Amino acid sequence: MDRLLSVVVSVYNEEKALEDFYKETTGILKDIDWAYELIFVNDGSSDQSLAILERLSASDRAVKVVSFSRNFGHEAAMIAGLDYSSGDGIICMDADLQHPPECIP
């Protein structure tokens, strides 16, 4: 049975960074020896972040989206993502690429 890595990603008004984050992160994750899930937590974004996340989720079954009705803050978003994750290992990241995906392996 494959080990599962959960990557929990806090998102707040990151429409400009989401596509790049997704491409860079999945590119890295596909090369590791674990199955993975990307759990994006939309923290009440007012831009197009949620629409982008829903599109990514529709095209990639490894992408899961949790969405808050309003901004509850970074810590609440991370806790929700941790609660939703089912991995044997968990990594927390921000969607703004502050944490380079290259650090995952």
Each model region followed by its residue ranges:
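Structured catalytic core of nucleotide-sugar glycosyltransferases
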Residues: 1-105
